[in-house]
């Protein structure tokens, strides 16, 4: 009850603070899911590095891949600080299918315009979700990392928007391809 009062008063919990196991487990599960999703998002983006049209888009896909994998590693690090699983155990669980990641990463992307649509829509949704979590986050390390992740996800969303608008205002064929991907 005192812990809930502390949280309700805007208290911030650090890794070495006393906390109920239910809180520790809930925070861990949430961060592990977020880390897994960032990792899988990076792998999805990675697949488009050689397929992206032109050097600029290839470099952009490479930079985004690095960002997503970097987010995952930061998140795995703070999840491990909760002393429920090590980083290695989390990776093994992910690769062996024992833990989860956001559903969108279960689907294959078949065309460049599909990739653009996914990049924009998923990054926009992730940004909105992460901003809401940031506002209400009581776990200090996660809140600090979210600040960085949110800044970079904003860049990713704007990049997706730029690519989507470029296709939408391109040739009739490009416009139709982009519209089909959005649909």
Give the location of each predicted region.
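Acidic, low-complexity proline/glycine-rich segments
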Residues: 1-14, 36, 88-98
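Acidic/His metal-coordination segments adjacent to aromatic residues that form catalytic metal sites
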Residues: 12-32, 93-119, 136, 167-174
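Helix-loop segments that flank and shape redox-cofactor active sites
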Residues: 19-23, 41-63, 126-142
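Alpha-helical scaffold segments that form or flank carboxylate-/histidine-based iron centers
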Residues: 24-34, 52-71, 115, 140-153
């Amino acid at each position: 009850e005192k812990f809930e009062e502390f949280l309700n008063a805007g208290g911030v919990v650090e890794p070495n603070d006393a906390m109920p196991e239910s809180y520790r487990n809930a925070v861990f599960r949430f961060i592990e899911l977020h880390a897994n999703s960032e990792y899988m998002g990076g792998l999805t983006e990675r697949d488009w590095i050689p397929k992206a049209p032109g050097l600029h888009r290839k470099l952009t896909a490479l930079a985004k891949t690095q960002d997503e994998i970097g987010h995952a590693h930061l998140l795995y690090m703070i999840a491990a600080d909760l002393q429920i699983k090590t980083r290695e155990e989390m990776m093994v669980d992910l690769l062996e299918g024992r833990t989860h990641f956001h559903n969108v990463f279960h689907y294959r992307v078949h065309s460049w315009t599909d990739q653009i649509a996914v990049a924009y829509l998923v990054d926009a949704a992730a940004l909105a979700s992460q901003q809401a979590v940031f506002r209400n986050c009581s776990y200090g390390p996660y809140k600090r990392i979210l600040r960085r992740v949110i800044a970079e996800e904003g860049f990713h969303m704007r990049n997706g928007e730029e690519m989507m608008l470029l296709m939408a205002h391109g040739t009739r064929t490009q416009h139709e391809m982009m519209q089909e991907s959005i649909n």
